Regions:
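Membrane-embedded segments
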Residues: 36, 40-120
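Substrate-gating cap/lid alpha-helix
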Residues: 209-243
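Well-ordered, non-membrane alpha-helical segments in soluble/globular domains
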Residues: 69-73, 179-187, 220-230
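Secreted/periplasmic serine-hydrolase-like ester/acetyl group-modifying domain
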Residues: 90, 99-199
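Active-site segments of SGNH/GDSL-like serine hydrolases
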Residues: 190-218
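N-terminal secretory targeting modules
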Residues: 1-32
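Histidine-centered active-site loop/cap adjacent to the catalytic His
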Residues: 256-284
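A structural motif corresponding to the C-terminal end of an alpha-helix
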Residues: 187-201, 230-241
Length: 284
């Protein structure tokens, strides 16, 4: 099971994570910045546009705070000795996610993650030949139907399109155990990083500016008033806020978008270059 993070029985989301785990074990010792979150940062932040730091992007589809927490506490903090910056996605419309929704099924079906856990995530030493085992494990082949490659994770420009909302915004309340738990988890993860001398940046990826004309924050709902309150709470955490969505009042044009909540190559360039400048500013 060593190094087998993905099997053919797992959801497609886990394929991208399998690729990211190989990247992790190959570059954990040298990387100075890590990015964690969902497909919004997977496609929205790209190391090729960042020059001030050596960036490892661990974003993958459905990578909510539960996945961010697991990867940070068990891998990032144990195996990234040169880490200066951790960039964590903060998307208010994910704040109602339960662990059982996305992360638990990935973890439960992954022999590699469970194997790592039985060895305390190799915190004392990584076994000889381990990276080779990860490399040789079941490897997904980029499907011709998917618009990106596993080499670069950049999307073509399709435009923002319609500001569609998948869930009923009235279904979600701010006074909610999941919201409270997820906010507490953000606080714990951020403080754990800061204690190790890592600066944390909370990035809010842009979505379709058309949501400003609806009652929803974004594609997965969440009322706009609730999102504003969640952003205020996030701003009180021990992290630098990088709000690129600005409640829809941003400057990411339609040519910078792949769809209603993902950036294209052009958008990724703008976001990544801004992050690069922020890295530089934070070290002045």
């Amino acid at each position: 099971s060593a190094g087998f993070y993905y099997t053919g029985q797992m959801e497609s989301d886990a394929r991208d994570l399998r690729v990211k785990m190989e990247w992790f074990w190959k570059s954990h010792a040298a990387a100075t910045a890590v990015v964690l979150g969902s497909s919004r940062v997977l496609f929205g932040i790209n190391a090729s546009f960042i020059h001030s730091e050596s960036v490892l992007n661990m974003g993958f589809p459905s990578g909510d705070i539960h996945a961010i927490s697991f990867l940070t506490l068990n891998y990032v903090l144990k195996h990234m000795p040169k880490l200066k910056f951790a960039v964590l996605e903060f998307s208010p419309d994910f704040m109602w996610d339960k662990e059982a929704l996305f992360w638990s099924p990935v973890y439960k079906k992954s022999p590699g993650f469970k194997y790592d856990k039985t060895h305390d995530f190799w915190k004392d030493s990584i076994p000889k030949g381990f990276v080779e085992l990860v490399e040789e494990s079941y490897k997904p082949i980029a499907e011709q139907t998917q618009p990106y490659s596993y080499d670069e994770f950049l999307m073509p420009s399709n435009g923002w399109g319609r500001a569609t909302v998948v869930h009923d915004t009235m279904k979600y309340e701010l006074d909610d155990d999941d919201v409270d738990y997820n906010m507490a988890l953000y606080k714990f993860v951020i403080n754990s990083l800061v204690e190790k001398g890592v600066q944390v940046i909370l990035v809010v990826p842009p979505q379709n500016p058309g949501y400003a004309k609806t009652g929803a924050f974004g594609i997965y709902a969440g009322r706009r008033s609730h999102a504003e309150e969640l952003l205020k709470r996030a701003a009180k955490l021990n992290a630098v806020m990088m709000d690129e969505n600005k409640m829809g009042k941003h400057d990411y044009t339609s040519s910078m978008a792949y769809n209603t909540d993902h950036l294209s190559r052009e958008g990724a360039k703008q976001l990544s270059e801004r992050l690069d400048s922020l890295f530089v500013d934070l070290q002045k």
